[in-house]
Amino acid sequence: MSQGLPHEWRTAETRDLFAAILSLRTQEEAERFFRDLCTLPEIEALTHRWQAAQLLDQGLPYHEVAARTGASTTTVTRVAQWLKRGADGYRLVLDRQKRTSGRTA
């Protein structure tokens, strides 16, 4: 665990961050906010995780997901674990995107 985050990650500070994210209205606003908030490697890491979640949801094997995304197999495995036993955040967004694009969940 990161030394900077307490065991209970839902703090007033993290809630404030999520409220700020929810105030964004467009993709351009999100891009601008995250570019200021994160380093390029942090954005790349988040992107790899999200791509991995999408590809794992399509049933691709771990090694292929790693090859396509540039994420390590450790990261792909971690994403797969969170897809199965996480807070259902990945599942929430994956299913929502499927519904809005007309695909079935």
In which residue ranges do the predicted regions lie?
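Short, amphipathic alpha-helical "recognition" segments used to contact nucleic acids or chromatin
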Residues: L46-L60
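General nucleic-acid-binding
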Residues: M1-L24
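Short, solvent-exposed alpha-helical "recognition" segments
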Residues: A80-L94
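Short alpha-helical "recognition helix" segments of helix-turn-helix
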Residues: E64-T69, V76
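N-terminal helix-turn-helix DNA-binding core of bacterial DNA-binding proteins
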Residues: L40-I43, Q54, V65
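Hydrophobic/basic alpha-helical segments enriched in Actinobacteria
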Residues: F18, E42, L60-Y62, Q97
